[in-house]
Protein backbone atom coordinates (compact mmCIF):
# COMPACT_ATOMS: atom_id res chain seq x y z
CA UNK A 1 0.00 0.00 0.00
CA UNK A 2 2.73 2.46 1.00
CA UNK A 3 4.89 1.58 -2.00
CA UNK A 4 1.86 2.00 -4.28
CA UNK A 5 1.30 5.52 -2.95
CA UNK A 6 4.93 6.51 -3.57
CA UNK A 7 4.82 4.93 -7.04
CA UNK A 8 1.62 6.74 -8.02
CA UNK A 9 2.90 10.17 -6.94
CA UNK A 10 6.39 9.61 -8.38
CA UNK A 11 5.05 8.46 -11.75
CA UNK A 12 2.56 11.35 -11.86
CA UNK A 13 5.30 13.91 -11.14
CA UNK A 14 7.50 12.40 -13.86
CA UNK A 15 4.70 12.19 -16.43
CA UNK A 16 3.85 15.87 -15.85
CA UNK A 17 7.49 16.90 -16.32
CA UNK A 18 7.86 18.06 -12.72
CA UNK A 19 10.88 15.81 -12.04
CA UNK A 20 13.48 14.15 -14.23
CA UNK A 21 14.52 10.52 -13.91
CA UNK A 22 16.66 11.09 -10.81
CA UNK A 23 15.48 14.40 -9.38
CA UNK A 24 12.91 15.17 -6.73
CA UNK A 25 12.05 13.20 -3.62
CA UNK A 26 9.08 12.12 -1.54
CA UNK A 27 8.59 11.33 2.13
CA UNK A 28 6.00 10.59 4.76
CA UNK A 29 6.18 10.85 8.53
CA UNK A 30 5.28 7.92 10.76
CA UNK A 31 5.75 8.84 14.42
CA UNK A 32 9.41 9.68 15.04
CA UNK A 33 10.47 8.06 11.74
CA UNK A 34 10.18 9.06 8.13
CA UNK A 35 10.13 7.07 4.94
CA UNK A 36 11.93 8.88 2.14
CA UNK A 37 12.96 8.01 -1.37
CA UNK A 38 16.47 6.68 -1.80
CA UNK A 39 19.33 8.86 -3.03
CA UNK A 40 19.25 8.94 -6.86
CA UNK A 41 16.04 6.91 -7.14
CA UNK A 42 13.93 7.19 -10.28
CA UNK A 43 10.54 8.54 -9.17
CA UNK A 44 8.97 7.23 -12.37
CA UNK A 45 9.75 3.61 -11.48
CA UNK A 46 10.05 3.31 -7.70
CA UNK A 47 10.60 -0.11 -6.16
CA UNK A 48 10.56 -1.28 -2.54
CA UNK A 49 14.37 -0.88 -2.33
CA UNK A 50 13.93 2.83 -3.19
CA UNK A 51 12.15 3.59 0.11
CA UNK A 52 14.37 4.27 3.11
CA UNK A 53 13.12 4.41 6.70
CA UNK A 54 15.19 6.53 9.05
CA UNK A 55 14.81 8.74 12.12
CA UNK A 56 13.46 12.26 12.03
CA UNK A 57 15.84 13.37 14.77
CA UNK A 58 18.79 11.01 14.53
CA UNK A 59 20.86 9.04 12.07
CA UNK A 60 20.90 5.27 11.78
CA UNK A 61 22.25 2.64 9.38
CA UNK A 62 19.78 3.67 6.65
CA UNK A 63 20.61 7.38 6.70
CA UNK A 64 23.42 7.26 4.07
CA UNK A 65 20.97 5.69 1.58
CA UNK A 66 18.35 8.41 1.96
CA UNK A 67 17.79 11.26 -0.48
CA UNK A 68 20.35 14.04 -0.45
CA UNK A 69 17.50 16.31 0.69
CA UNK A 70 17.00 14.33 3.93
CA UNK A 71 18.14 17.31 6.01
CA UNK A 72 15.37 19.47 4.50
CA UNK A 73 12.69 16.82 5.08
CA UNK A 74 13.85 16.40 8.69
CA UNK A 75 13.77 20.16 9.34
CA UNK A 76 10.24 20.38 7.90
CA UNK A 77 8.95 17.50 10.04
CA UNK A 78 10.67 18.90 13.15
CA UNK A 79 9.13 22.36 12.69
CA UNK A 80 5.70 21.83 11.11
CA UNK A 81 2.67 19.56 11.38
CA UNK A 82 3.36 18.08 7.93
CA UNK A 83 2.92 14.34 7.49
CA UNK A 84 4.00 14.22 3.83
CA UNK A 85 6.45 16.13 1.61
CA UNK A 86 6.83 16.37 -2.15
CA UNK A 87 10.01 17.99 -3.50
CA UNK A 88 9.88 18.59 -7.24
CA UNK A 89 11.51 20.74 -9.91
CA UNK A 90 8.51 22.21 -11.75
CA UNK A 91 10.00 24.22 -14.64
CA UNK A 92 7.67 27.23 -14.68
CA UNK A 93 7.66 27.65 -10.90
CA UNK A 94 11.45 27.32 -10.88
CA UNK A 95 11.77 29.90 -13.68
CA UNK A 96 9.60 32.38 -11.77
CA UNK A 97 11.63 31.74 -8.60
CA UNK A 98 14.61 33.25 -10.40
CA UNK A 99 12.88 36.59 -10.95
CA UNK A 100 10.24 36.97 -8.21
CA UNK A 101 10.49 37.33 -4.42
CA UNK A 102 7.18 35.54 -4.16
CA UNK A 103 4.97 33.88 -6.72
CA UNK A 104 1.51 35.34 -6.75
CA UNK A 105 -1.32 35.22 -9.21
CA UNK A 106 -5.09 35.06 -9.24
CA UNK A 107 -4.56 31.66 -10.85
CA UNK A 108 -2.96 30.30 -7.66
CA UNK A 109 -6.23 30.72 -5.82
CA UNK A 110 -8.18 29.20 -8.73
CA UNK A 111 -5.93 26.14 -9.16
CA UNK A 112 -5.05 25.25 -5.60
CA UNK A 113 -6.51 27.78 -3.17
CA UNK A 114 -3.10 29.30 -2.44
CA UNK A 115 -2.10 32.85 -1.74
CA UNK A 116 1.36 34.15 -2.61
CA UNK A 117 4.05 31.46 -2.49
CA UNK A 118 7.34 32.63 -0.94
CA UNK A 119 10.62 32.13 -2.78
CA UNK A 120 13.17 30.99 -0.21
CA UNK A 121 16.72 32.14 -0.86
CA UNK A 122 15.75 35.02 -3.20
CA UNK A 123 18.09 37.88 -2.32
CA UNK A 124 18.91 36.22 1.02
CA UNK A 125 22.28 35.60 2.52
CA UNK A 126 21.89 32.15 4.01
CA UNK A 127 24.64 30.64 6.13
CA UNK A 128 26.01 27.35 4.79
CA UNK A 129 23.85 24.49 6.01
CA UNK A 130 21.01 26.79 7.13
CA UNK A 131 18.71 26.47 4.09
CA UNK A 132 16.77 23.48 5.55
CA UNK A 133 15.74 25.60 8.55
CA UNK A 134 14.84 28.56 6.32
CA UNK A 135 12.61 26.29 4.19
CA UNK A 136 11.00 24.76 7.29
CA UNK A 137 10.35 28.19 8.77
CA UNK A 138 8.62 29.34 5.56
CA UNK A 139 6.48 26.18 5.57
CA UNK A 140 5.10 26.99 9.03
CA UNK A 141 2.72 29.45 7.34
CA UNK A 142 2.55 27.97 3.82
CA UNK A 143 1.78 24.61 2.25
CA UNK A 144 4.36 25.10 -0.49
CA UNK A 145 7.48 27.19 -1.05
CA UNK A 146 9.74 27.69 -4.02
CA UNK A 147 13.49 27.57 -3.51
CA UNK A 148 15.43 30.09 -5.59
CA UNK A 149 16.42 28.35 -8.83
CA UNK A 150 15.92 24.88 -7.36
CA UNK A 151 12.29 23.78 -7.24
CA UNK A 152 9.52 23.44 -4.68
CA UNK A 153 8.80 21.76 -1.36
CA UNK A 154 5.13 21.07 -0.67
CA UNK A 155 3.61 19.66 2.49
CA UNK A 156 0.34 18.04 3.43
CA UNK A 157 -1.31 15.61 5.77
CA UNK A 158 -1.35 13.19 2.83
CA UNK A 159 1.10 12.86 -0.04
CA UNK A 160 -1.76 13.50 -2.49
CA UNK A 161 -2.34 16.87 -0.84
CA UNK A 162 1.32 17.89 -1.25
CA UNK A 163 1.20 16.64 -4.86
CA UNK A 164 -1.90 18.75 -5.54
CA UNK A 165 -0.19 21.89 -4.21
CA UNK A 166 2.80 21.14 -6.45
CA UNK A 167 0.74 20.63 -9.60
CA UNK A 168 -1.57 23.55 -8.86
CA UNK A 169 1.38 25.91 -8.41
CA UNK A 170 3.01 24.70 -11.62
CA UNK A 171 -0.21 25.14 -13.64
CA UNK A 172 -0.63 28.69 -12.33
CA UNK A 173 3.04 29.48 -13.02
CA UNK A 174 2.74 28.14 -16.57
CA UNK A 175 -0.12 30.56 -17.21
CA UNK A 176 1.88 33.45 -15.72
CA UNK A 177 4.88 32.57 -17.93
CA UNK A 178 2.66 32.35 -21.03
CA UNK A 179 1.08 35.71 -20.20
CA UNK A 180 4.52 37.29 -19.73
CA UNK A 181 5.70 35.82 -23.05
CA UNK A 182 2.74 37.51 -24.76
CA UNK A 183 3.52 40.83 -23.11
CA UNK A 184 0.59 40.79 -20.69
CA UNK A 185 1.27 43.13 -17.83
CA UNK A 186 4.37 44.51 -19.55
CA UNK A 187 4.88 47.78 -21.33
CA UNK A 188 3.11 47.57 -24.67
CA UNK A 189 1.04 44.53 -23.67
CA UNK A 190 -2.76 44.60 -23.73
Describe the function of each predicted region.
Residues 1-190:
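Glycine-rich flexible loops
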